[in-house]
């Protein structure tokens, strides 16, 4: 979340910057609440001082043998007023906190200004889409022809937006995840982690999915115990490793990677990508997270994005990189790059990774800090996250870009060691 001090001291400037994201900050309401808070706080502090003085005078009156009943009554009355004032302060602060938790991050000055995805800016492209000399099939047709992809059985088991992978495609899916993990740990310096797939609410508050995006989550309610949520991304569990910690500066940067399933309700996706594996309730993803010193986070974003790009380059999959505009960025991001891979059957690029610098936005929620060696004082870290990559969408891209006229699929060179040396499936 944003720094409340920044909000108080530069409210209109913050509102103007948020407007570029299409977010209307209720300046009048915040100003009114702040005025109430100051008034009640001043009154409460004065009342506390008066009560302390009156309490002291009770002892003095006792020593003089005076009737202390009126003083006792005053102290009791002031105590009741203090309790009332503190309760009022708590209510005001609760409303301010509620507003604060609903405010998105401020965009970095380098982020292009725009209302929606049309305002995104293409930064670069890599590779050239294959010019097929035969009628191409989409991944669904390729998979169902051989019985490798079974959406009918998946629907019988779980409903819409699930997939059952079998045989060579299941193996190819596993190979992709193993390849990605090995690349990031072996060449990019990430520490592999195996994390819980179920987390409690504070973890999701820390990474900003709660309270604003609860409808996108799958929730498990347990009688007498804390609710649990299925992770929408390993970003949640990986980033929260440092929640509540004060790290030594020598520990930074921390770089974590994990291969996990992800679970999303896709509440706002009705009618979109209903065919195939592009948009699922359950999908696998290899997630990268970095925890860094504030001065290095923008440079770290470039490195994180390059790590994700390397996966696509080694797989020889054409892609492009977009700098997301202010109106299309995620809630907690300062700056985001999207990687989009070429999907031949759709004749367009589709998102396969989103790499974001969240600045101190998540760290403030989590109270994740490091000790500044120059001042000796704790300061908030910066957090970054990115897909490296979404495994299911990468599988889609491999199937379609490596298809042959007879419906078989060539195995990318870097995956052959994970496929027992197979060169073609189908």
Swiss-Prot record:
List UniProt keywords, sorted A-Z.
Aminoacyl-tRNA synthetase, ATP-binding, Cytoplasm, Ligase, Nucleotide-binding, Protein biosynthesis
Sequence segments annotated as region (Disordered) = 41-64
Q: Which Gene3D superfamilies match?
A: Bira Bifunctional Protein, Domain 2, Serine-tRNA synthetase, tRNA binding domain
**Where does this protein chiefly localize?**
cytoplasm
Location(s) in or outside the cell: Cytoplasm
Query: What is a GO molecular function of this protein?
Result: serine-tRNA ligase activity
Q: Which reaction does it catalyse?
A: tRNA(Ser) + L-serine + ATP = L-seryl-tRNA(Ser) + AMP + diphosphate + H(+); tRNA(Sec) + L-serine + ATP = L-seryl-tRNA(Sec) + AMP + diphosphate + H(+)
**Any Gene Ontology CC annotation:** cytoplasm
Reply yes or no: does the keyword Transmembrane helix apply. Answer: no
tRNA processing found in the keyword field: no
Q: In which pathway does it act?
A: Aminoacyl-tRNA biosynthesis; selenocysteinyl-tRNA(Sec) biosynthesis; L-seryl-tRNA(Sec) from L-serine and tRNA(Sec): step 1/1
What does the similarity note say?
Answer: Belongs to the class-II aminoacyl-tRNA synthetase family. Type-1 seryl-tRNA synthetase subfamily.
This protein's assembly is summarised as: Homodimer. The tRNA molecule binds across the dimer.
Q: Which PANTHER family match?
A: SERINE--TRNA LIGASE (PTHR43697:SF1), SERYL-TRNA SYNTHETASE (PTHR43697)
User: What is the name of this protein?
Assistant: Serine--tRNA ligase
What organism, scientifically named, is this protein from?
Answer: Pseudomonas fluorescens (strain ATCC BAA-477 / NRRL B-23932 / Pf-5)
Q: What is the gene name?
A: serS
């Amino acid at each position: 979340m944003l720094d409340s001090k920044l909000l108080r001291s530069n409210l209109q400037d913050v509102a103007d910057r948020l407007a570029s994201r299409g977010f209307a900050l209720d300046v009048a309401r915040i100003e009114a609440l702040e005025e109430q808070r100051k008034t009640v706080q001043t009154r409460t502090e004065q009342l506390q001082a008066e009560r302390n003085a009156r309490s002291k005078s009770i002892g003095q009156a006792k020593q003089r043998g005076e009737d202390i009943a009126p003083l006792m009554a005053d102290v009791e009355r002031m105590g009741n007023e203090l309790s009332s004032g503190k309760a009022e302060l708590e209510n005001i602060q609760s409303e301010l906190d509620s507003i604060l938790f609903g405010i998105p991050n401020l965009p970095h000055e380098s982020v292009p200004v725009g209302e929606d995805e049309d305002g995104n800016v293409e930064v670069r492209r890599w590779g050239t889409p294959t010019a097929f000399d035969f009628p191409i099939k989409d991944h669904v047709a390729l998979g169902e022809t051989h019985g490798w992809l079974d959406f009918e059985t998946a629907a019988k088991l779980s409903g819409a937006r699930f997939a059952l992978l079998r045989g060579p495609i299941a193996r190819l899916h596993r190979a992709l995840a193993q390849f990605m993990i090995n690349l990031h740990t072996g060449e990019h310096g990430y520490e592999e982690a195996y994390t819980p797939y179920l987390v409690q609410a504070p973890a999701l508050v820390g990474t900003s999915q709660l309270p604003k995006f609860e409808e996108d989550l799958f929730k498990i309610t347990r009688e007498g115990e804390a609710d649990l949520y299925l992770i929408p991304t390993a970003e949640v569990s990986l980033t929260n490793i440092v929640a509540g910690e004060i790290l030594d500066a020598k520990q930074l940067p921390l770089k974590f990677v994990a291969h996990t399933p992800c679970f999303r309700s896709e509440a706002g996706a009705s009618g979109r990508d209903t065919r195939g594996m592009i948009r699922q309730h359950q999908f696998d993803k290899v997630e990268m997270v970095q925890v860094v010193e504030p001065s290095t986070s923008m440079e770290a974003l470039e490195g994180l994005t390059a790590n994700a790009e390397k996966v696509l380059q080694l797989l020889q999959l054409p892609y492009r990189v977009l700098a997301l505009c202010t109106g299309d960025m995620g809630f907690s991001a300062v700056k985001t790059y999207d990687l989009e891979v070429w999907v031949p059957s759709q004749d367009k690029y589709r998102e396969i990774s989103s790499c974001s610098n969240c600045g101190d936005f998540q760290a403030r929620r989590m109270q994740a800090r490091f000790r500044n060696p120059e001042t000796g004082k704790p300061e908030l870290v910066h957090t970054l996250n990115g897909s490296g990559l979404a495994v299911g969408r990468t599988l889609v891209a491999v199937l379609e870009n490596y298809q042959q006229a007879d419906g078989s699929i060539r195995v990318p060179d870097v995956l052959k060691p994970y496929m027992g040396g197979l060169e073609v499936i189908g």
